[in-house]
């Protein structure tokens, strides 16, 4: 019987991810104060903290399907992890803007939205809170050699922001947003100083 399956992950090992921002996203950060977070969203083939294992081929299939939602700007996630298979738009905090496989790991990039839940998420990140990510999906499980294996009927619903991920190294990290904003502020100060000197 299909059931709601929720998995928790830290987003980046040590809280630091490689620079995954495009030039357009960096410009959006500078011009619109946008915020992006990146990291590991899920992992296939390993036993997680919930004692479940997602076969890699199932994860690859679901990432391929989910990438269509990403392309259509419909890959939304909530702040916290509800016990529902339906995304509540009132609680949406972020939108997945990129997703890909890196070996057995599902990697992704999320844009923090200007919703009430997104503002809470932004405040947490700005305060240095280490946030995790959790997958939410529907599917059956079976017991095999002492492990709980997710079966082929699994359907990925979304990725939610959580405080306690169940899989190591599924913590999200700020994708240069703060660094880019600090560089813009410094550049603006220099430009203002030069303008002030030239006017005098």
Model-inferred region functions:
Residues 50-60, 90-94, 153-155:
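Surface-exposed flexible segments
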Residues 51-53, 85-86, 148-149:
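Short, solvent-exposed loop/turn motifs
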Residues 1-71, 182-190, 199:
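Polar/acidic, low-complexity leader/linker segments enriched in S/T/G and N/D
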Residues 5-15, 76, 88, 94-187:
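Residue microenvironments linked to proteolytic maturation
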Residues 52-53, 79, 162:
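Compositionally biased, intrinsically disordered/low-complexity regions enriched for serine, proline
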Residues 44-46, 83-85, 114-116:
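Short, charged/polar surface micro-motifs in flexible loops or helix N-caps
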Residues 65-67, 71-87, 133:
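Short conserved beta-strand and strand-loop elements enriched in small hydrophobics
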